[in-house]
Amino acid sequence: VGTVGVPTSGVEWRIAKGGDDDMGGEFQIKGEMVFAGYYKNPEATAQSIVNGWLHTGDVVRLQDGQIKIVDRLKDIMITAGGKNLTPSEIENTMKASPYIKECVIVAEGRKFVGALVMIDYETVGKWAEARRIAFTHFRSLVETPEVRQLIDAEIASGNAKLAQVAQIRNFHMLTKELDHDDGEVTATMKVRRS
């Protein structure tokens, strides 16, 4: 579970270490199946293919002989203490909660992990209605103390599944839903990091 399988036979591959053995390294492949390069873009080709090795940009690690994709190399964050963190692992752990729809990690150059959290309005709304908690819209629901306590507990539960350095120590709940029209998410509803 959570792996992409084993490399195809006849393919040379390697995991290029980046300094943090727990995290893994960049998956690189070499062979006839590697494309010749980007059309009319020699600079991009030179960055992606070095000495015949295709640098995929995927950070992977071996798990029981299987390749597990950890994150994209460009998304890895380095804390002030020099620890490499994979945001997607932390974010997906938190989004396993039915009450958390989005979680965006903030850790680059910081002493600890912070997060922006967006509740799942439908699920949290039903939870609040069952407890007779009054609210009229997204923001009013987020701002109730009971919802803050609920999300505190969900973050604590998620943190228990993570290494100490990856645990969220501070978070802010968004008072509006992320919106494609505002440029906060892509057309496929993936959070824009920049």
Put a short name on every predicted segment.
Residues V1-S9, N41-A44, Y121:
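Active-site loops of AMP-binding adenylate-forming
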Residues M77, E102, E154-S194:
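Conserved C-terminal "lid"/linker of ANL adenylate-forming enzymes
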Residues K17, V59, S97-T123:
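C-terminal boundary motif of the adenylate-forming
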